[in-house]
Amino acid sequence: MKPLTTGELPATADPQAREGMGNSLMDRKTILFFAEAVTLAHVARPLALIEAPDTSRYHRVFACDPRCQWLLGDFAGEFCPVPSIASDTFLNRLAQGKPVYDTATLEAYVHDDLSLFEKVKPDLVIGDFRLSLSVSARLARIPYLAISNAYWSPYYRVPAYPVPSLPLTRLLPIGLATMLFRLARPLAFALHARPLDQVRRKYGMSSLGHDVRRAYTDADHILYADLPQFFPTLSLPANHHFIGPIIWKPPVSTPLWWDALSSERPIVYVTLGSSGQGALLPHVLQALSDLEVTVIAATAGSSLAGAIPANAYVAQYLPGDEASHRASLVVCNGGSLNVSDENPLKFSSSIFRRRSEPGIGEAECRSSFVRKPCW
């Protein structure tokens, strides 16, 4: 029998029954956007994408740690609080070259994920660095899309991973540090992949191998928030997709000084991001204080110690694309909202990346295509 559409409902049907039939046919699908709130980027990217679905067809749910709920601004969908490890814990472990999650944490995440699935009953899950979804979404048989960066793709044709900024590598000559890191990298990638692999085995799932890149990109579909021209790949599977830079603005008003900035001197935009070493910001501002420039800086929510130089204007958050548009030079930590979003490149600004972001090569890979101008 041919199914009825809402326009073909029998005219003689009871009005209440007719309304009920229409509503059942118009039920919306539920999309759950799941952010791991360890850095601003992992919350901002799904927040930017959540505006895309047609709300007449899809019910939108956003899940993240409550500490980041304010970033939702005037989001009209449903919010579900789900805990994440502290950002400081995440960054400290990265800075020491340690796996950011242990097995117990990922197991707890899986239980939290499944509880949320039971409550929300999503038809689709879109996650950003919520590694436990590799297990929980499969257990619940829910299609899972993961937002990632192409430099974490196993198919990225990287000639050699740059040396990360770690305590040991900072003490060694760059040549020696490079040689040692190239020898140790496979072991480091295996070490970071092990906790998720252990959780997968507990639930009877196959190993992803000894490569953290597969742990970071295990999903039914992978969405790379990058441009393929910057990150060439080899034999990219059909379920891996380049979706381009994800542009996001924090839900805050611009500071009072924003519209009063003079255009007589070059503007330098400084942001060390939420995953950089914010304690370095005063030193960067001081280094720029004697130049004939106007400095605008974002602290990404952290407090700023010391006096602000006379040529500097500081706010917790700034609209990155607009700041890049106004700036002649962008000084950043190589974070994914600064470089991988290509905001400065879009507006033809020069970029200087302060090597401050911890990790096992993330910021270095992300900004390897950026020319660092002499200034």
Language model features by range: what are they?
Residues 351-353:
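Acidic, Mg2+-coordinating phosphoryl-transfer loop and its flanking beta/alpha structural elements
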Residues 145-232:
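Active-site-proximal region of nucleotide-activated glycan assembly enzymes
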Residues 1-24:
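N-terminal amphipathic/basic-hydrophobic helices that include classical n-h-c signal peptides
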Residues 50-51, 70, 226-329:
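Donor-nucleotide binding loops and adjacent catalytic segments primarily
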Residues 35, 96-102, 117, 192-199, ...:
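Short, basic, glycine/proline-bearing loop/turn elements
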Residues 66, 129-131, 228-229, 275-278, ...:
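Short beta->alpha connector loops
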Residues 23-136, 142-157, 161-175, 296-342, ...:
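Glycosyltransferase specificity loop/lid
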